[in-house]
Amino acid sequence: MATPSMMPQWSYMHISGQDASEYLSPGLVQFSQATETYFNLNNKFRNPTVAPTHDVTTERSQRLQLRFVPVDKEDTQYTYKTRFQLAVGDNRVLDMASTFFDIRGTLDRGPSFKPYSGTAYNIMAPKSAPNNCQYLDPKGETEAGKVNTIAQASFVGPIDETTGDIKITEEEDEETTIDPLYEPQPQLGPSSWSDNIPSATSGAGRVLKQTTPRQPCYGSYASPTNIHGGQTKDDKVTPLYFTNNPATEAEALEENGLKPNVTLYSEDVDLKAPDTHLVYAVNQTQEFAQYGLGQQAAPNRANYIGFRDNFIGLLYYNSNGNQGMLAGQASQLNAVVDLQDRNHRTSYQLFLDSLYDRSRYFSLWNQAIDSYDKDVRVLENNGVEDEMPNFCFPIGAIETNMTFTQLKKSENGGSRATTWTKENGDDGGNGAEHYLGIGNLNAMEINLTANLWRSFLYSNVALYLPDKYKFSPPNVPIDPNTHSYDYINKRLPLNNLIDTFVNIGARWSPDVMDNVNPFNHHRNYGLRYRSQLLGNGRYCKFHIQVPQKFFALKSLLLLPGATYTYEWSFRKDVNMILQSTLGNDLRADGAKINIESVNLYASFFPMAHNTASTLEAMLRNDTNNQTFIDFLSSANMLYPIPANVTNLPISIPSRNWAAFRGWSFTRLKHNETPALGSPFDPYFTYSGSIPYLDGTFYLGHTFRRISIQFDSSVAWPGNDRLLTPNEFEVKRTVDGEGYTVAQTNMTKDWFLVQMLAHYNIGYQGYHLPEGYRDRTYSFLRNFEPMCRQVPDYANHKDEYLEVPTTNQFNSSGFVSAAFTAGMREGHPYPANWPYPLIGEDAVQTVTQRKFLCDRTLWRIPFSSNFMSMGTLTDLGQNLLYANSAHALDMTFEVDAMDEPTLLYVLFEVFDVCGVHQPHRGVIEAVYLRTPFSAGNATT
């Protein structure tokens, strides 16, 4: 087999296309064209699901897919390892491209799993309304007479004067004895507002004893303890009797004794809050007193948990040792050699995007790409359409709390004086009833559209603010582990950072949110879909089909007449294989996975004997090696950027740059990037999207400038661009020359480079890319320009004051001053923020511009003739770089971030794997990655 040094230079870039016909050898392409009725080689994906229509020799050859059971398996703490024996019979060709693992097991997504927003329990209750309950006096004393009650006796009916129990009437109008273990039921009451005319004088209900902990009605749950729905936990229900008439014992004696007109059945229940928590709480000494009645609940934050897109992270690819094996019968040497930086996970994401629309979801391979709502990432604060006031009225509309007596008019004899007397029937206590209201109908106004918009901003933006803009509510116990769900869930955002008046009228992403991972959000529809595939319960069984994405083997055909050993390891680290909305540490929060079985499904091409023999002979020929190229075809490197650092120099030692195509790069957060060399990274306490693996890049906007300098005197890429050679300016804050573009701070130069690199559009005239090029990860689709005006504080220091958010007030008296979702406080008063930017009172402003470009890898193509790169191959490269060794120095200037990050650089090199099978049971593989590394393996 040819060694790397023997491969001719001229052939490097002529097999760089992604279509199979471009990188298979000519002989094999000719063969595939002659046998199109058997299988299709387009785009690396074969379709072996339809049997051929002729030349099929045996029944066995029509079995297109076989299940292989592992001959050996090893279940350890961190991995599950399986080994298979692949027997490829005569007249059969095994297609490793379409193999997949069929995995069954059980999954505990942990107590942090919450697949919905809001609460499932008493969602209609006000957030701080108490349940019917008893409470202690403010001093917390419990002696007789010191236990107070607050309750609604909704079950209206007469009270038995002898027993004190409420009388319940059955359908036959017969009164029955109640069962206090569940009667009266709390959901029953008058069916209509008119049932309360006249006002009910007696009734009953249930009430929680003072020994049951305080909890707002919103989110309250107590499990039933009997089939009737009763909830008392010890079968001890104590009736309590109350009266409100007469008031004193002396009056009672005149009325023949005191009589109850309200009976409450008190009980202790197992009160819980499964999906809510307190955001306003009193200290423990006041919890059982009246102060505990006003505690406020909020729903736990939604946290979808499912397998990652395309099961990223489940198959363990070690970059330092061989965790996978493909060995032939004749030798046990491993054909899966050390491919330290093949990027195959990110490559696979971009590869699939080039094949079909990733906005379509497929359950079979868990293909539901991570996404975010653009209306959340880039806020268009258009205000609210609230020209019409919104009123709410009493259910009966007319007030019924004022009772009137009907009069009649009569004239008095000769004096004709008018007198008034009661109408007949209205005299005494048995007269007619008249409930009359005076004036307009009583109503209350609520600004529905403003509340909906404010609620959207709070739930979708404010709750996702960085932790430094949040506080821990007093008296609420919080886990000190900042990566835990309890901590993330209970922290509250500071007021006025995100509200209806912030950036009103602008299309602008809040600056504090730009560096927050937008894919870690409950509006990540791909993650939500993958979570829902597993069901809506914490504990679930899973049965998944996981494709093998290892690019060295992706399109490999195993030839007939041999047995191969094939083994792989599967991770069991829940932070790596599962993805959560909030990115909390699933290990610490109790998630667990148990793999019960792994089978391998492999597809064969059934062929007639002559056809199979011909294919085998051709593939065994030295000139017909199977040649496979990684989609990104790059060597990746990670460079740490410490917190608050803005300059990062990189040096690459001297080497030959033949076949080099350029650079792709972006920025990653350190805590979102695992160490891939270990099956279990103890420092990876995060479970959100992993940009390093799944392509959810979002920090591209933090680059300012890149300089690239070879150690030669030749200026690269020439002085035919706007700026100086060897330097690329991404954005500029001050633009005196007008070098920025598209109402942003991106330079025209950088815009030109990206259009060249992504679409091969080499001029700045009006031109749009072809549709097939503008896919999910492309430049223009993700380019988000933004612009806004802010008061000119610098030049008007005496007039315009930068009031801190804690001293800003807007809608005072109608909203909370403590945090956005709190109870309203204060009184109506003119707002002091923001400064008006419109109308006759508009202040002097300055214009701010910026952009976001998520998902996209910035690219700088490498060519000596930069403006005439053609199809971006190496054909135009200067011979100085192509045939001589040079050292490379790069300097990246970036925005400072207050946490450690990583510079992710892809050196677009020639990355190829050649596979040869000269004899049955023997596989030879050569791996070439110039200019960075080469290797080979023979089995």
Swiss-Prot record:
It comes from the Viruses. This is Hexon protein. All late proteins expressed from the major late promoter are produced by alternative splicing and alternative polyadenylation of the same gene giving rise to non-overlapping ORFs. A leader sequence is present in the N-terminus of all these mRNAs and is recognized by the viral shutoff protein to provide expression although conventional translation via ribosome scanning from the cap has been shut off in the host cell. One of its GO terms (molecular function) is structural molecule activity. It holds the Pfam family Adeno_hexon_C. Keywords: Acetylation, Capsid protein, Cytoplasmic inwards viral transport, Host nucleus, Host-virus interaction, Late protein, Microtubular inwards viral transport, Phosphoprotein, T=25 icosahedral capsid protein, Virion, Virus entry into host cell. It comes from Porcine adenovirus A serotype 3. The modification N-acetylalanine is found at A2. Its main location: virion. InterPro entries: Adenovirus_Pll_hexon_C, Adenovirus_Pll_hexon_N, Adenovirus_Pll_hexon_sub2, Adenovirus_Pll_hexon_sub3, ADV_hexon, VP_dsDNA_II. Major capsid protein that self-associates to form 240 hexon trimers, each in the shape of a hexagon, building most of the pseudo T=25 capsid. Assembled into trimeric units with the help of the chaperone shutoff protein. Transported by pre-protein VI to the nucleus where it associates with other structural proteins to form an empty capsid. Might be involved, through its interaction with host dyneins, in the intracellular microtubule-dependent transport of incoming viral capsid to the nucleus. It is found in: Virion; Host nucleus. Induction: Expressed in the late phase of the viral replicative cycle. Belongs to the adenoviridae hexon protein family. Homotrimer. Interacts with the capsid vertex protein; this interaction binds the peripentonal hexons to the neighboring penton base. Interacts with the hexon-linking protein; this interaction tethers the hexons surrounding the penton to those situated in the central plate of the facet. Interacts with the hexon-interlacing protein; this interaction lashes the hexons together. Interacts with host dyneins DYNC1LI1 and DYNC1I2; this interaction might be involved in intracellular microtubule-dependent transport of incoming viral capsid. The record marks G762 as: Involved in interaction with pre-protein VI. GO terms for cellular component: host cell; host cell nucleus; T=25 icosahedral viral capsid. The modification Phosphotyrosine is found at Y927. The keyword Phosphoprotein applies. The keyword rRNA-binding does not apply. GO terms for biological process: microtubule-dependent intracellular transport of viral material towards nucleus; symbiont entry into host cell. The gene is L3.
